């Protein structure tokens, strides 16, 4: 981080598990129980909104995806990524 980064970066959340997304960002657990699971456009949007609301930041970015080495528990393929921004 460069000089003054503290004035631009409020903080961050690492919510790898579905439970963490519910506990830390306030996602409805029902949203994560759908056929597509935690890697969807809707989940990314809700994560960004939760991060914004809980951090007090004006803008939040969220990324959810499947890192690998194999598909996730919901059958989503490695490399699938959803990104959202909440303003």
Segments and roles (model prediction):
Residues 1-87:
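Short alpha-helical segments enriched in small residues
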């Amino acid at each position: 981080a460069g000089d003054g980064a503290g004035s631009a970066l409020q903080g961050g959340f690492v919510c790898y598990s579905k439970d963490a997304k519910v506990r830390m960002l306030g996602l409805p657990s029902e949203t994560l129980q759908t056929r597509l699971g935690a890697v969807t456009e809707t989940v990314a949007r809700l994560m960004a909104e939760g991060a914004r609301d809980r951090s007090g930041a004006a803008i939040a970015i969220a990324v959810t995806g499947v890192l690998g080495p194999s598909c996730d528990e919901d059958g989503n393929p490695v490399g699938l990524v959803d990104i959202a921004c909440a303003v």
